[in-house]
Amino acid sequence: GLLHEKIISDRRVTVFERTNIKNLSGDSLAQTFDIVVVDLSFISLRTVMKNILSLANSDASIVMLIKPQFEATKLEASKSKGVIVDREIWIRTITEVLLSASEHGGNAQDIIVSPVPGKAGNKEFLLLISKQFPSQDLRLSELV
């Protein structure tokens, strides 16, 4: 895994590295969490949004790393050899993740460009979601 030992050993942290999120839900675990942090690879957040949000308490903070290379179409990703540099694709894929979150009771609070680029140099985005507070205008056109 990639988590620092200090995080892994913290008794307040439940780690689900190398776990298929499709098999997880608040119901299957019989618990939900105050903070949910999501960093997925090779899968769209949209396909598992219901699972992600089901893991969060009603007043939880949910932080998702949006990786446009996994949200874009296969054609878009293959055209650019997996490195998405098109601003329109960034905005569209972020918007699609936001809509998916909204469909499952998640409300966008904030978004930033990740200070750490993806391995191949992809621009990635950290999204803060809440179930408790109303959605905020993220001004995506100013972000990218």
Residue spans for each PLM region:
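Short, glycine-/aromatic-enriched active-site segment of Class I SAM-dependent methyltransferases
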Residues: P68-V85
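Short alpha-helix
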Residues: W90-H104
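S-adenosyl-L-methionine
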Residues: G1-T47
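Conserved S-adenosyl-L-methionine
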Residues: G106-P115
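Flexible, glycine-/basic-rich loop-and-beta segments that form/coincide
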Residues: K123, S130-V144
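A short glycine-rich, Lys/Arg-flanked "PGG" loop and its adjoining helix->strand segment in the class I
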Residues: R46-V63
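Residue-level signal for inorganic ion chemistry
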Residues: L3, K67, G121
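Short "lid" loop at the C-terminus of a central beta-strand within the Rossmann-like core
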Residues: I21-K22, P68-A72, P115-V116
